[in-house]
Amino acid sequence: SSAASDVYKRQVNALTIEYRATTDKATVVNLTNHGFFNLAGISTPTPTVNDHIVTINADFYTPIDEVSIPTGEITKVEGTPMDFRTPHTVGERINDKFQQLIFGAGYDHCYVLNKIENGSLDLAATCKDPKSGRIMEVYTTEAGVQLYTGNWLNGFEGAHGATFPARSAICFEAQCFPDTPNKPHFPLATLLPGDEYQQITVYKFAVEE
């Protein structure tokens, strides 16, 4: 059997998520959260995140196949619409005739983070809404972060009557690379008895003056 917990700590202008897990048999553990963000705010309908400006601290990403499973390749972002090493809006290249964006119907890919050292809490991504000036920074101890641009949102109704059409939210899901058990060269995600899985992800918020 296995046991897992996650602790949410709300601070001034920040949300910290701490994950822990133990097991009595070897098991794969790759925890994350699927929080959706729109820094422009919600409405009916909620606007797309196409104008959000994103930076991701990653030189490589994991390409996917036609059913969104990683192929096992680790590919350079350089020279492709996947490159967010310098700030770009989400919408700038999301509709390019690039096979990876076609497979994902937009961005739905794991970025291989440039880590200072294994397990260090580093800045993974920054997201900014230029109209409101709201900024979100994502820090994590994980090796990767999945960028998802709400490609399959279909107009469902959320809190306060807000509706969410396609691409009206963005996710930064800190995690080990998806499908790691089937890709031996990906970072190991197997938890052994006697060990404890630990992960920290921090979302920091600010408003540009």
Write out the residue ranges for each language-model feature.
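Short, small-residue-biased leader/transition segments that mark boundaries at the very start
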Residues: 1-8
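Active-site pocket scaffolds in enzymes
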Residues: 79-209
